[in-house]
Design a protein with these regions (language model features):
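Terminal targeting signals and extreme-terminal segments of soluble enzymes
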Residues: 1-163
Length: 163
């Protein structure tokens, strides 16, 4: 993978675009620490509407954990794709990926106010990506793990280019 400065600038710009999305803002989520093939999605302060996991007002709902994983692993994939040489001439917002499968194992109750989902790419090609991650509470306790598969869609001009 090409990890030169221009690609890192493009990754940073795309990250800002994700942080400006209405969905992430409404949920109080932020894509933070990013590197090629890695990402962290943080929930600095859980909202009352995000609680209720296991029937308790103190536990984060599993749905919140799921969409945080989807964002962290998905963003890790986007950052890897943007670092590929064939991505150097495309608009980063034209590159798409969709979740095929997201498998989550819940290990501990997610209790507290702030949480983070960490994602990293395990394997990636032009059409398919595999990623995994961990979900941690403010004390660093791993509350859940995830692994998933994503389908990658390049802009038509790139998709038709010989490999």
């Amino acid at each position: 993978m090409n990890t030169n400065a221009p690609n890192l600038d493009r990754i940073a710009a795309c990250k800002q675009g994700w942080n400006d999305s209405p969905f992430l803002k409404a949920q109080g989520l932020e894509v933070e620490e990013t590197a090629v093939g890695r990402a962290v999605v943080r929930l600095p302060k859980a909202l009352p509407t995000q609680r209720g996991g296991g029937g308790s007002d103190t536990v984060l709902n599993g749905g919140v954990i799921s969409y945080m994983f989807d964002g962290a692993l998905g963003w890790a994939i986007i950052s890897s794709l943007l670092a590929m040489p064939e991505a150097s001439d495309i608009d980063p917002f034209e590159l798409r990926q969709f979740t095929i499968n997201l498998d989550i194992t819940f290990l501990n109750a997610a209790v507290g106010d702030s949480f983070e989902a960490r994602g990293k790419v395990v394997r990636i090609s032009r059409t398919t990506a595999f990623a995994e991650g961990e979900f941690l509470d403010a004390n660093g306790t791993v509350c859940a793990t995830a692994k998933g598969i994503w389908r990658v869609f390049w802009p038509r001009s790139i998709a038709s280019t010989p490999r």
